[in-house]
């Protein structure tokens, strides 16, 4: 990254309308409480439509029936998505039983959706059930605060089931960072939990009155697993251990995957190394990164507002020096670390504490009772007897964690009886999609509903070329916002229009390289034809242990993205 021509620390100009909305919202209250009582519409009006995002919700509608309802002169079938705050993806079995019941009784779709940010979402919550869902979460010690919009989102933590002590320490830091960076406004408690209004002035010492310029994502990662995809995130703490004990973190800043089709001022970017810090400085450094982005991030153009753009504009050394100044530290040199993979190890793994951990593959993270595979019922039955916890992974899977030897057989029987341990090939285990249609308002093409059958066809290509047990990290995202993390895949499909995608190639298995667009706006037959040819070449020409993405770069099929701000669109 060039340091020769750093830009201004603050972007001058007319602020975006989102900044007006936040300023006028009275610390995120708006008129949400009044809007809740408006029975004339199933949605939220005006600024409240956006303000509810700070409370963990998005207003959506069923796009499959949107045109039909419009023809009948009806408003869209409004319903909310709610995303829980769940640092590190850890959820107790008591909490699981509560969310299972709510999904069954109070949502249109009856499902629980595990996300690749280690939490769960409810889709299809009608307006009348919005307040009850927040109260249900509160009753079991959960909330949805700051899981959307311009705040520090759900903090991820490697779902490492092997080194229990290290995971426990890293998870505690993920929780501490999450709590430290939460908004201080009482709006959430007043609106959803009926807590009394206190006659004090709200203050936001870290986030400020207008919060952050854009969404902000944080991870705690334990090498050698990069399961949380650190390069998709603004701020990353890479755990450094000595003798199995956590001693500090390497800090990487400025990753992010969202782009806009055709807008060359937007690009996906991997995170940059800042340095090493001892544990005692973790919260001060986290706060310093967030407040620097708060003050320097672009508030005039939301498409250019994320930390990755701030870092490129002001220069890495300038941003790093400001973080050091605010935190009162000097970063030490980066300590050695290495990533070897991103996938979850499906099946049983024994931890060093002699407890067992069962990782269940959940295709696309969608937990529902399917014909012949009652996944939702199976997990409920396991939750009723399991003494440990569940962990949601960043690959949208679920770990039944800390199972004693005496419970192992019983839990396995329940899992098998409910279709939770059906064997799948490595390719399916390493494929992922965002939700997209029918609920996401931004979706341009199918993703979750498209991926299973598309994976069948890719598996057939692998079989045809004699490598049925190989895998390629493959991801589909329904729009360029990139929730499916296709911009860190070996094969990335980015929705362009119904049935059409941009095909990106050249990422790698460990998730440290951005893939480049190979073909634009193509349909499934063209995608499969390209993959058939390239996978055939990979099978014949690859070097020992060479992944598909690395092969496409070495063979000159695609040029690697080396400096995204300058060469992503070339």
From Swiss-Prot:
| InterPro entries from the UniProt entry | CysI, NiRdtase/SiRdtase_haem-b_fer, Nit/Sulf_reduc_fer-like_dom_sf, NO2/SO3_Rdtase_4Fe4S_dom, NO2/SO3_Rdtase_4Fe4S_prot, NO2/SO3_Rdtase_4Fe4S_sf, NO2/SO3_Rdtase_FeS/sirohaem_BS
Q: Which domain of life is it from?
A: Bacteria
EC no.? Answer: 1.8.1.2
What is one Pfam family matched by this protein? NIR_SIR_ferr
Q: Entry's PANTHER family?
A: SULFITE REDUCTASE [NADPH] SUBUNIT BETA, SULFITE REDUCTASE [NADPH] SUBUNIT BETA-RELATED
Cofactor names from the entry are: siroheme; [4Fe-4S] cluster
Q: Does the keyword Thylakoid apply?
A: no
Q: Which pathway is it part of?
A: Sulfur metabolism; hydrogen sulfide biosynthesis; hydrogen sulfide from sulfite (NADPH route): step 1/1
Q: What positions does the entry give for [4Fe-4S] cluster binding?
A: 434, 440, 479, 483
Alphabetically sorted, this entry's keywords are: 4Fe-4S, Amino-acid biosynthesis, Cysteine biosynthesis, Heme, Iron, Iron-sulfur, Metal-binding, NADP, Oxidoreductase
Function of this protein? Component of the sulfite reductase complex that catalyzes the 6-electron reduction of sulfite to sulfide. This is one of several activities required for the biosynthesis of L-cysteine from sulfate.
Instruction: Name residues in a coiled coil.
Output: none
Instruction: Identify the enzyme class.
Output: oxidoreductase
Q: Which organism is it from?
A: Salmonella typhimurium (strain LT2 / SGSC1412 / ATCC 700720)
Q: What gene does the UniProt entry assign to this protein?
A: cysI
SUPFAM superfamilies given in the database record? Nitrite and sulphite reductase 4Fe-4S domain-like (SSF56014), Nitrite/Sulfite reductase N-terminal domain-like (SSF55124)
PROSITE patterns given for it? NIR_SIR (PS00365)
- Provide a GO CC annotation, any one: sulfite reductase complex (NADPH)
**Bound cofactor: record note:** Binds 1 siroheme per subunit.
Q: What is this protein called?
A: Sulfite reductase [NADPH] hemoprotein beta-component
Subunit structure, as described in the record: Alpha(8)-beta(8). The alpha component is a flavoprotein, the beta component is a hemoprotein.
